Amino acid sequence: MGYPGQRPVIPPQSHRDDRETLVSEHKHKGKTCRQSAAVFNVVNSIIGSGIIGLPYSMKQAGFPLGILLLFWVSYVTDFSLILLIKGAALSGTDTYQSLVNRTFGFPGYLLLSVLQFLYPFIAMISYNIITGDTLSKVFQRIPGVDPENLLIGRHLIIVLSTVVFTLPLSLYRDIAKLGKISLISTVLTTLILGIVVARGVSLGPHIPKTEDAWIFAKPNAVQAVGVMSFAFICHHNCFLVYGSLEEPTVAKWSHIIHVSTLISVFISILFATCGYLTFTGYTQGDLFENYCRNDDLVTFGRFCYGVTVILTYPIECFVTREVIANVFFGGNLSSVCHIIVTVVIITVATLVSLLIDCLGIVLELNGVLCAAPLIFIIPSACYLKLSEEPRTHSDKIMSCVMLPIGAVVMAVGFVMAVTSPQDCSHGQEMFYCSPDNFSLTNISISHFQLTTQLSILNVSIFQ
Protein backbone atom coordinates (compact mmCIF):
# COMPACT_ATOMS: atom_id res chain seq x y z
CA MET A 1 0.00 0.00 0.00
CA GLY A 2 1.18 3.48 -0.76
CA TYR A 3 1.52 5.11 2.63
CA PRO A 4 2.88 8.67 2.74
CA GLY A 5 6.45 7.50 2.95
CA GLN A 6 5.97 5.48 -0.21
CA ARG A 7 4.43 8.21 -2.37
CA PRO A 8 6.08 11.11 -4.12
CA VAL A 9 6.08 14.32 -2.16
CA ILE A 10 4.33 17.12 -4.01
CA PRO A 11 6.53 20.20 -3.83
CA PRO A 12 5.12 23.60 -2.91
CA GLN A 13 4.02 25.56 -5.94
CA SER A 14 3.91 29.09 -4.53
CA HIS A 15 6.18 30.44 -7.27
CA ARG A 16 4.76 28.35 -10.08
CA ASP A 17 1.44 28.16 -11.85
CA ASP A 18 -0.74 25.44 -10.33
CA ARG A 19 -1.18 23.86 -13.75
CA GLU A 20 2.53 23.08 -14.06
CA THR A 21 3.99 19.61 -13.77
CA LEU A 22 4.31 18.15 -10.30
CA VAL A 23 7.77 16.64 -9.93
CA SER A 24 8.84 14.33 -7.13
CA GLU A 25 11.69 15.61 -4.94
CA HIS A 26 12.93 12.11 -4.29
CA LYS A 27 12.85 8.75 -5.94
CA HIS A 28 9.51 7.05 -5.59
CA LYS A 29 10.14 4.05 -3.36
CA GLY A 30 6.76 2.40 -3.84
CA LYS A 31 5.72 0.41 -6.84
CA THR A 32 4.21 2.34 -9.72
CA CYS A 33 1.52 1.60 -12.26
CA ARG A 34 0.85 2.66 -15.83
CA GLN A 35 -1.81 5.17 -16.80
CA SER A 36 -4.05 2.38 -18.08
CA ALA A 37 -3.94 0.63 -14.71
CA ALA A 38 -4.69 3.95 -13.00
CA VAL A 39 -7.71 4.45 -15.28
CA PHE A 40 -9.04 1.01 -14.38
CA ASN A 41 -8.48 1.70 -10.67
CA VAL A 42 -10.44 4.97 -10.90
CA VAL A 43 -13.23 3.46 -13.02
CA ASN A 44 -13.44 0.48 -10.69
CA SER A 45 -13.71 2.81 -7.71
CA ILE A 46 -16.53 4.78 -9.39
CA ILE A 47 -18.38 1.80 -10.83
CA GLY A 48 -18.67 0.01 -7.52
CA SER A 49 -21.80 -0.71 -5.52
CA GLY A 50 -23.15 2.75 -6.33
CA ILE A 51 -24.00 1.96 -9.95
CA ILE A 52 -26.64 -0.54 -8.86
CA GLY A 53 -28.56 2.33 -7.26
CA LEU A 54 -28.51 4.71 -10.24
CA PRO A 55 -31.86 3.52 -11.68
CA TYR A 56 -33.27 4.11 -8.19
CA SER A 57 -31.96 7.69 -8.34
CA MET A 58 -33.92 8.17 -11.58
CA LYS A 59 -37.05 7.10 -9.71
CA GLN A 60 -36.32 9.62 -6.96
CA ALA A 61 -35.47 12.62 -9.12
CA GLY A 62 -37.78 12.03 -12.08
CA PHE A 63 -36.27 10.47 -15.18
CA PRO A 64 -35.56 13.61 -17.29
CA LEU A 65 -34.14 15.58 -14.36
CA GLY A 66 -32.27 12.50 -13.17
CA ILE A 67 -30.35 12.22 -16.44
CA LEU A 68 -29.41 15.91 -16.30
CA LEU A 69 -28.29 15.58 -12.67
CA LEU A 70 -26.19 12.52 -13.52
CA PHE A 71 -24.31 14.45 -16.21
CA TRP A 72 -23.83 17.34 -13.78
CA VAL A 73 -22.52 15.12 -10.96
CA SER A 74 -20.08 13.46 -13.37
CA TYR A 75 -18.77 16.87 -14.49
CA VAL A 76 -18.37 18.04 -10.89
CA THR A 77 -16.56 14.80 -10.05
CA ASP A 78 -14.12 15.29 -12.93
CA PHE A 79 -13.51 18.92 -11.98
CA SER A 80 -13.06 18.33 -8.24
CA LEU A 81 -10.68 15.38 -8.69
CA ILE A 82 -8.33 17.58 -10.68
CA LEU A 83 -8.90 20.45 -8.26
CA LEU A 84 -7.66 18.30 -5.38
CA ILE A 85 -4.31 17.66 -7.06
CA LYS A 86 -4.00 21.36 -7.89
CA GLY A 87 -4.62 22.12 -4.23
CA ALA A 88 -1.94 19.62 -3.30
CA ALA A 89 0.44 21.39 -5.68
CA LEU A 90 -0.26 24.74 -4.04
CA SER A 91 0.20 23.40 -0.51
CA GLY A 92 3.06 20.97 -1.12
CA THR A 93 1.13 18.02 0.32
CA ASP A 94 0.67 14.44 -0.84
CA THR A 95 -2.52 13.22 0.88
CA TYR A 96 -6.09 14.49 1.14
CA GLN A 97 -5.67 14.76 4.91
CA SER A 98 -2.41 16.71 4.80
CA LEU A 99 -3.95 19.06 2.20
CA VAL A 100 -6.87 19.92 4.49
CA ASN A 101 -4.56 20.11 7.51
CA ARG A 102 -2.34 22.62 5.71
CA THR A 103 -5.40 24.63 4.63
CA PHE A 104 -7.73 24.57 7.64
CA GLY A 105 -5.57 23.30 10.48
CA PHE A 106 -6.21 20.46 12.89
CA PRO A 107 -10.04 20.86 13.11
CA GLY A 108 -10.31 20.54 9.35
CA TYR A 109 -7.95 17.58 9.43
CA LEU A 110 -10.11 15.75 11.97
CA LEU A 111 -13.33 16.48 10.06
CA LEU A 112 -11.89 15.19 6.81
CA SER A 113 -10.42 12.14 8.52
CA VAL A 114 -13.87 11.22 9.84
CA LEU A 115 -15.49 11.71 6.42
CA GLN A 116 -12.69 9.99 4.56
CA PHE A 117 -12.97 7.01 6.88
CA LEU A 118 -16.76 6.82 6.99
CA TYR A 119 -17.37 6.95 3.24
CA PRO A 120 -15.28 3.92 2.22
CA PHE A 121 -16.22 2.11 5.43
CA ILE A 122 -19.94 2.46 4.67
CA ALA A 123 -19.17 1.51 1.07
CA MET A 124 -17.60 -1.70 2.39
CA ILE A 125 -20.82 -2.39 4.28
CA SER A 126 -22.86 -1.85 1.12
CA TYR A 127 -20.56 -4.19 -0.80
CA ASN A 128 -21.19 -6.91 1.76
CA ILE A 129 -24.95 -6.35 1.54
CA ILE A 130 -24.81 -6.67 -2.24
CA THR A 131 -22.60 -9.76 -2.07
CA GLY A 132 -25.01 -11.49 0.30
CA ASP A 133 -28.11 -10.52 -1.69
CA THR A 134 -26.80 -11.36 -5.14
CA LEU A 135 -24.81 -14.54 -4.51
CA SER A 136 -27.52 -16.09 -2.32
CA LYS A 137 -29.92 -15.87 -5.27
CA VAL A 138 -27.25 -17.31 -7.55
CA PHE A 139 -26.82 -20.39 -5.37
CA GLN A 140 -30.59 -20.82 -5.10
CA ARG A 141 -30.70 -21.45 -8.86
CA ILE A 142 -28.32 -24.41 -8.66
CA PRO A 143 -30.32 -27.60 -9.42
CA GLY A 144 -31.00 -29.66 -6.31
CA VAL A 145 -30.24 -26.85 -3.87
CA ASP A 146 -32.98 -26.04 -1.37
CA PRO A 147 -33.64 -22.25 -1.45
CA GLU A 148 -34.21 -22.37 2.33
CA ASN A 149 -30.84 -24.01 3.02
CA LEU A 150 -28.95 -22.00 5.64
CA LEU A 151 -25.66 -22.74 3.87
CA ILE A 152 -26.69 -20.43 1.01
CA GLY A 153 -28.17 -17.75 3.26
CA ARG A 154 -26.93 -14.18 2.84
CA HIS A 155 -25.29 -14.08 6.27
CA LEU A 156 -23.08 -17.11 5.70
CA ILE A 157 -22.22 -15.93 2.18
CA ILE A 158 -21.11 -12.54 3.53
CA VAL A 159 -18.87 -14.20 6.11
CA LEU A 160 -17.37 -16.72 3.66
CA SER A 161 -16.72 -14.14 0.91
CA THR A 162 -15.01 -11.94 3.49
CA VAL A 163 -12.74 -14.66 4.85
CA VAL A 164 -11.90 -16.27 1.50
CA PHE A 165 -11.69 -13.28 -0.86
CA THR A 166 -11.95 -9.71 0.44
CA LEU A 167 -9.73 -10.09 3.50
CA PRO A 168 -6.76 -11.63 1.62
CA LEU A 169 -7.03 -9.03 -1.17
CA SER A 170 -7.26 -6.21 1.37
CA LEU A 171 -4.01 -7.29 3.03
CA TYR A 172 -2.01 -6.01 0.05
CA ARG A 173 0.07 -2.95 0.94
CA ASP A 174 0.42 -1.59 -2.61
CA ILE A 175 -2.65 -0.39 -4.51
CA ALA A 176 -0.81 -0.71 -7.84
CA LYS A 177 -1.13 -4.50 -7.49
CA LEU A 178 -4.90 -4.14 -7.86
CA GLY A 179 -4.67 -2.78 -11.42
CA LYS A 180 -5.29 -6.15 -13.09
CA ILE A 181 -8.03 -6.97 -10.59
CA SER A 182 -9.69 -3.65 -11.44
CA LEU A 183 -9.51 -4.56 -15.14
CA ILE A 184 -11.36 -7.81 -14.45
CA SER A 185 -13.96 -5.91 -12.44
CA THR A 186 -14.46 -3.40 -15.27
CA VAL A 187 -14.95 -6.22 -17.81
CA LEU A 188 -17.54 -7.88 -15.56
CA THR A 189 -19.35 -4.56 -15.17
CA THR A 190 -19.58 -4.33 -18.96
CA LEU A 191 -21.20 -7.79 -19.04
CA ILE A 192 -23.68 -6.71 -16.37
CA LEU A 193 -24.51 -3.63 -18.41
CA GLY A 194 -25.22 -5.84 -21.42
CA ILE A 195 -27.59 -7.99 -19.36
CA VAL A 196 -29.47 -4.95 -18.02
CA VAL A 197 -29.83 -3.59 -21.57
CA ALA A 198 -31.02 -6.97 -22.88
CA ARG A 199 -33.60 -7.30 -20.14
CA GLY A 200 -34.72 -3.73 -20.73
CA VAL A 201 -35.64 -4.75 -24.28
CA SER A 202 -37.19 -8.15 -23.51
CA LEU A 203 -38.73 -7.54 -20.09
CA GLY A 204 -39.56 -3.83 -20.04
CA PRO A 205 -42.60 -3.93 -22.39
CA HIS A 206 -44.32 -6.53 -20.19
CA ILE A 207 -44.11 -4.62 -16.89
CA PRO A 208 -46.79 -1.95 -16.39
CA LYS A 209 -45.47 1.60 -16.10
CA THR A 210 -46.33 3.62 -13.02
CA GLU A 211 -48.38 6.79 -13.38
CA ASP A 212 -45.50 9.07 -12.40
CA ALA A 213 -42.94 7.30 -14.62
CA TRP A 214 -42.28 10.27 -16.92
CA ILE A 215 -42.62 13.22 -14.53
CA PHE A 216 -39.78 15.69 -15.17
CA ALA A 217 -38.89 16.31 -11.51
CA LYS A 218 -39.82 14.81 -8.15
CA PRO A 219 -39.39 16.05 -4.55
CA ASN A 220 -36.65 13.51 -3.77
CA ALA A 221 -34.21 14.97 -6.31
CA VAL A 222 -31.79 16.01 -3.55
CA GLN A 223 -31.63 12.44 -2.26
CA ALA A 224 -31.04 11.33 -5.85
CA VAL A 225 -27.98 13.59 -5.98
CA GLY A 226 -26.77 11.83 -2.84
CA VAL A 227 -27.09 8.41 -4.50
CA MET A 228 -25.31 9.72 -7.63
CA SER A 229 -22.57 11.25 -5.50
CA PHE A 230 -22.13 7.91 -3.77
CA ALA A 231 -21.77 6.26 -7.17
CA PHE A 232 -19.23 8.71 -8.58
CA ILE A 233 -17.04 9.62 -5.65
CA CYS A 234 -13.49 8.32 -5.64
CA HIS A 235 -11.88 11.38 -4.02
CA HIS A 236 -11.04 9.43 -0.88
CA ASN A 237 -8.54 7.29 -2.81
CA CYS A 238 -7.42 9.66 -5.59
CA PHE A 239 -4.11 10.42 -3.84
CA LEU A 240 -3.42 6.69 -3.57
CA VAL A 241 -3.90 6.28 -7.32
CA TYR A 242 -2.00 9.50 -8.08
CA GLY A 243 0.88 8.38 -5.88
CA SER A 244 1.12 5.06 -7.73
CA LEU A 245 1.81 6.77 -11.10
CA GLU A 246 5.22 6.88 -12.72
CA GLU A 247 6.35 10.54 -12.61
CA PRO A 248 2.92 11.92 -11.64
CA THR A 249 1.97 15.25 -13.22
CA VAL A 250 -1.18 17.39 -13.27
CA ALA A 251 -1.45 16.91 -17.04
CA LYS A 252 -1.16 13.13 -16.74
CA TRP A 253 -3.65 13.07 -13.88
CA SER A 254 -6.11 15.25 -15.79
CA HIS A 255 -5.96 12.89 -18.77
CA ILE A 256 -6.56 9.87 -16.53
CA ILE A 257 -9.53 11.54 -14.83
CA HIS A 258 -11.10 12.71 -18.11
CA VAL A 259 -10.88 9.21 -19.61
CA SER A 260 -12.09 7.54 -16.41
CA THR A 261 -15.03 9.93 -16.05
CA LEU A 262 -16.09 9.50 -19.69
CA ILE A 263 -16.06 5.71 -19.36
CA SER A 264 -17.91 5.88 -16.05
CA VAL A 265 -20.61 8.32 -17.18
CA PHE A 266 -21.28 6.29 -20.35
CA ILE A 267 -21.75 3.10 -18.33
CA SER A 268 -23.76 4.93 -15.66
CA ILE A 269 -26.17 6.67 -18.05
CA LEU A 270 -26.82 3.47 -19.98
CA PHE A 271 -27.26 1.44 -16.79
CA ALA A 272 -29.54 4.02 -15.14
CA THR A 273 -31.66 4.48 -18.26
CA CYS A 274 -32.18 0.80 -19.07
CA GLY A 275 -32.75 -0.13 -15.43
CA TYR A 276 -35.30 2.62 -14.82
CA LEU A 277 -37.16 2.21 -18.12
CA THR A 278 -37.62 -1.48 -17.34
CA PHE A 279 -39.22 -1.04 -13.90
CA THR A 280 -40.06 2.72 -13.63
CA GLY A 281 -41.72 3.39 -10.26
CA TYR A 282 -41.08 -0.14 -9.00
CA THR A 283 -37.28 0.32 -9.13
CA GLN A 284 -35.49 -0.76 -5.93
CA GLY A 285 -32.27 0.53 -4.38
CA ASP A 286 -30.63 -2.71 -5.50
CA LEU A 287 -31.74 -3.13 -9.12
CA PHE A 288 -31.24 -6.90 -9.02
CA GLU A 289 -34.01 -7.08 -6.41
CA ASN A 290 -36.42 -6.18 -9.23
CA TYR A 291 -35.66 -9.21 -11.37
CA CYS A 292 -37.38 -12.56 -10.96
CA ARG A 293 -35.40 -15.31 -9.29
CA ASN A 294 -36.01 -17.77 -12.13
CA ASP A 295 -34.30 -15.53 -14.68
CA ASP A 296 -31.11 -17.41 -15.50
CA LEU A 297 -29.57 -14.60 -17.54
CA VAL A 298 -29.98 -12.20 -14.61
CA THR A 299 -28.66 -14.91 -12.29
CA PHE A 300 -25.44 -14.82 -14.31
CA GLY A 301 -25.51 -11.02 -13.99
CA ARG A 302 -25.90 -11.33 -10.23
CA PHE A 303 -22.87 -13.60 -10.13
CA CYS A 304 -20.81 -11.11 -12.17
CA TYR A 305 -21.86 -8.24 -9.95
CA GLY A 306 -21.10 -10.18 -6.79
CA VAL A 307 -17.58 -10.81 -8.10
CA THR A 308 -17.27 -7.14 -9.11
CA VAL A 309 -18.01 -5.77 -5.65
CA ILE A 310 -15.73 -8.36 -4.06
CA LEU A 311 -12.90 -7.11 -6.28
CA THR A 312 -13.76 -3.45 -5.56
CA TYR A 313 -13.91 -3.94 -1.79
CA PRO A 314 -10.11 -3.89 -1.21
CA ILE A 315 -9.74 -0.40 -2.73
CA GLU A 316 -12.11 1.00 -0.10
CA CYS A 317 -10.33 -0.91 2.64
CA PHE A 318 -7.02 0.64 1.52
CA VAL A 319 -8.43 4.10 2.22
CA THR A 320 -9.92 3.34 5.63
CA ARG A 321 -6.63 1.76 6.67
CA GLU A 322 -4.61 4.74 5.46
CA VAL A 323 -6.79 7.16 7.44
CA ILE A 324 -6.17 5.16 10.61
CA ALA A 325 -2.45 4.94 9.78
CA ASN A 326 -2.20 8.72 9.31
CA VAL A 327 -4.25 9.69 12.37
CA PHE A 328 -2.97 7.18 14.92
CA PHE A 329 0.35 5.83 13.61
CA GLY A 330 2.00 8.79 11.91
CA GLY A 331 1.37 7.39 8.44
CA ASN A 332 3.33 4.15 8.81
CA LEU A 333 2.15 0.71 9.88
CA SER A 334 4.41 -2.17 10.79
CA SER A 335 3.58 -5.53 9.23
CA VAL A 336 1.85 -6.70 12.40
CA CYS A 337 -0.15 -3.48 12.82
CA HIS A 338 -1.04 -3.57 9.13
CA ILE A 339 -2.63 -7.00 9.55
CA ILE A 340 -4.36 -6.17 12.84
CA VAL A 341 -5.87 -2.89 11.58
CA THR A 342 -7.07 -4.54 8.36
CA VAL A 343 -8.70 -7.44 10.22
CA VAL A 344 -10.42 -5.10 12.71
CA ILE A 345 -11.81 -2.82 9.97
CA ILE A 346 -13.15 -5.72 7.91
CA THR A 347 -14.58 -7.49 10.96
CA VAL A 348 -16.56 -4.44 12.07
CA ALA A 349 -17.82 -3.78 8.52
CA THR A 350 -18.91 -7.41 8.22
CA LEU A 351 -20.78 -7.37 11.54
CA VAL A 352 -22.68 -4.21 10.59
CA SER A 353 -23.59 -5.58 7.15
CA LEU A 354 -25.06 -8.68 8.80
CA LEU A 355 -27.53 -6.44 10.65
CA ILE A 356 -28.65 -4.33 7.65
CA ASP A 357 -30.39 -5.71 4.58
CA CYS A 358 -31.77 -2.63 2.77
CA LEU A 359 -29.31 -1.02 0.36
CA GLY A 360 -31.28 2.12 -0.57
CA ILE A 361 -30.98 3.93 2.77
CA VAL A 362 -27.26 3.05 2.96
CA LEU A 363 -26.64 4.65 -0.45
CA GLU A 364 -28.67 7.76 0.43
CA LEU A 365 -27.08 8.48 3.80
CA ASN A 366 -23.54 7.78 2.65
CA GLY A 367 -24.13 9.99 -0.37
CA VAL A 368 -25.48 13.05 1.43
CA LEU A 369 -23.38 12.83 4.62
CA CYS A 370 -20.01 11.75 3.25
CA ALA A 371 -19.88 11.90 -0.55
CA ALA A 372 -21.38 15.39 -0.89
CA PRO A 373 -18.80 17.16 1.33
CA LEU A 374 -15.92 15.12 -0.15
CA ILE A 375 -16.94 16.01 -3.73
CA PHE A 376 -18.51 19.46 -3.51
CA ILE A 377 -17.44 21.25 -0.34
CA ILE A 378 -13.90 20.35 0.73
CA PRO A 379 -12.06 20.47 -2.64
CA SER A 380 -13.68 23.82 -3.43
CA ALA A 381 -12.95 25.30 0.00
CA CYS A 382 -9.30 24.22 -0.12
CA TYR A 383 -8.72 25.61 -3.60
CA LEU A 384 -10.45 28.92 -2.84
CA LYS A 385 -8.23 29.47 0.19
CA LEU A 386 -4.96 28.36 -1.43
CA SER A 387 -5.19 29.71 -4.97
CA GLU A 388 -3.98 33.21 -5.80
CA GLU A 389 -5.78 33.22 -9.15
CA PRO A 390 -8.15 36.18 -9.77
CA ARG A 391 -11.78 35.79 -8.70
CA THR A 392 -12.85 35.64 -12.33
CA HIS A 393 -10.72 32.54 -12.96
CA SER A 394 -12.88 29.62 -14.14
CA ASP A 395 -11.67 27.30 -11.39
CA LYS A 396 -12.60 29.82 -8.70
CA ILE A 397 -16.01 30.53 -10.22
CA MET A 398 -16.83 26.83 -10.36
CA SER A 399 -15.58 26.35 -6.81
CA CYS A 400 -17.85 29.16 -5.59
CA VAL A 401 -20.79 27.40 -7.23
CA MET A 402 -19.96 23.92 -5.95
CA LEU A 403 -19.48 24.85 -2.29
CA PRO A 404 -23.00 26.14 -1.44
CA ILE A 405 -24.66 23.47 -3.59
CA GLY A 406 -22.81 20.79 -1.66
CA ALA A 407 -23.96 22.29 1.64
CA VAL A 408 -27.59 22.26 0.47
CA VAL A 409 -27.37 18.67 -0.77
CA MET A 410 -25.83 17.57 2.52
CA ALA A 411 -28.35 19.29 4.81
CA VAL A 412 -31.57 18.82 2.84
CA GLY A 413 -30.67 15.31 1.69
CA PHE A 414 -30.06 14.11 5.25
CA VAL A 415 -33.34 15.55 6.53
CA MET A 416 -35.33 14.01 3.67
CA ALA A 417 -33.61 10.63 3.94
CA VAL A 418 -34.50 10.43 7.64
CA THR A 419 -38.01 11.90 7.49
CA SER A 420 -39.11 10.32 4.19
CA PRO A 421 -37.46 6.90 3.94
CA GLN A 422 -38.16 4.92 0.78
CA ASP A 423 -39.78 1.49 0.87
CA CYS A 424 -37.53 -1.54 0.62
CA SER A 425 -38.83 -4.87 -0.67
CA HIS A 426 -35.68 -6.79 0.17
CA GLY A 427 -35.88 -10.52 -0.51
CA GLN A 428 -39.45 -10.39 -1.83
CA GLU A 429 -40.51 -11.41 -5.30
CA MET A 430 -42.12 -8.55 -7.20
CA PHE A 431 -45.79 -8.92 -8.18
CA TYR A 432 -44.96 -9.34 -11.87
CA CYS A 433 -42.94 -12.47 -11.05
CA SER A 434 -46.08 -14.31 -9.95
CA PRO A 435 -46.82 -17.57 -11.85
CA ASP A 436 -50.16 -16.01 -12.79
CA ASN A 437 -48.26 -13.48 -14.91
CA PHE A 438 -47.76 -15.62 -18.00
CA SER A 439 -45.38 -13.28 -19.77
CA LEU A 440 -42.81 -13.55 -16.99
CA THR A 441 -43.02 -17.16 -15.84
CA ASN A 442 -40.29 -18.22 -18.27
CA ILE A 443 -38.22 -15.06 -18.15
CA SER A 444 -34.97 -16.82 -18.98
CA ILE A 445 -36.13 -17.69 -22.47
CA SER A 446 -35.32 -15.45 -25.38
CA HIS A 447 -37.40 -12.43 -26.32
CA PHE A 448 -38.37 -14.14 -29.56
CA GLN A 449 -39.71 -17.19 -27.73
CA LEU A 450 -41.55 -15.00 -25.24
CA THR A 451 -43.24 -13.02 -28.00
CA THR A 452 -44.19 -16.22 -29.81
CA GLN A 453 -45.77 -17.72 -26.70
CA LEU A 454 -47.75 -14.55 -26.05
CA SER A 455 -49.03 -14.56 -29.64
CA ILE A 456 -50.12 -18.22 -29.36
CA LEU A 457 -51.89 -17.40 -26.09
CA ASN A 458 -53.77 -14.52 -27.70
CA VAL A 459 -54.85 -16.74 -30.61
CA SER A 460 -56.12 -19.43 -28.26
CA ILE A 461 -58.11 -16.87 -26.29
CA PHE A 462 -59.84 -15.53 -29.40
CA GLN A 463 -60.59 -19.08 -30.58
From Swiss-Prot:
Q: Where is the composition biased (Basic and acidic residues)?
A: 14-25
Q: What's an example Gene Ontology biological process for this entry?
A: amino acid transmembrane transport
UniProt-annotated glycosylation sites, renumbered to this chain: N437, N442, N458
Could you tell me the membrane topology recorded for this protein?
Multi-pass membrane protein
Question: Which Pfam families does the record cross-reference, listed alphabetically?
Answer: Aa_trans
Cell compartment(s), UniProt: Membrane
List, alphabetically, the GO terms of the cellular component aspect: membrane
Q: Does the keyword field hold DNA-binding? A: no
Which regions span the lipid bilayer?
38-58, 65-85, 105-125, 150-170, 178-198, 225-245, 256-276, 298-320, 336-356, 358-378, 397-417
The UniProt function text for this chain reads: Putative sodium-dependent amino acid/proton antiporter.
The entry sums up its family as follows:
Belongs to the amino acid/polyamine transporter 2 family.
| Descriptive protein name | Putative sodium-coupled neutral amino acid transporter 11
* Species of the source: Bos taurus
